[in-house]
């Protein structure tokens, strides 16, 4: 998504975008928004490149729901290099970047035995260990807003494409009717 597109859809002026979203002087309003983190640095620091969640929003079925749940499912795990793990994406390399807002939570598991006698850990829920700077309701609202933005940023023209699609289908239906009538006219002498 481009800075200009965000400004247009959010009703922001060019100066508001430059002052609040563009953090380098060399950027122009028509350029794409990209991560400021170098993928090589991310691989060195976290063991893997950080995922682009806007692509996840577009490619996964129910991508918005997945991102929302993912951002709320980090828990403390001392065995991981980042100190956290995730219920939705186990052993993820991404750190919990929103930990100051959400706080720390512990995942509670119970052990169940299946019909074959194999034991499995089953997630039961989270327990808050340390409060963040936001209440749970505020954090939920903020994550919902972030998720909605990422879903929109994954395909900014989606609403326009869908609106235009009805006109295209309507045109094709009319064209089909005209082609059918023309075919009947051409073939009436043969039948």
Regions found by a protein language model. Name each.
Residues 2-131, 140-144, 150:
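Extracytoplasmic electron-transfer domains, predominantly the class I c-type cytochrome c fold
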Residues 75, 151-154, 182, 186:
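Hydrophobic/aromatic-lined pockets within catalytic cores
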Residues 123-131, 135, 151, 162-174:
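C-terminal low-complexity, acidic/polar tails when present
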Residues 128-130, 157, 184:
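C-terminal lobe and adjacent flexible extensions of AdoMet/dcAdoMet transferase-like proteins
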Residues 136-160, 164:
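Juxtamembrane amphipathic/hinge helix adjacent to a transmembrane helix
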Residues 161-191:
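Juxtamembrane interface at the cytosolic side of transmembrane helices
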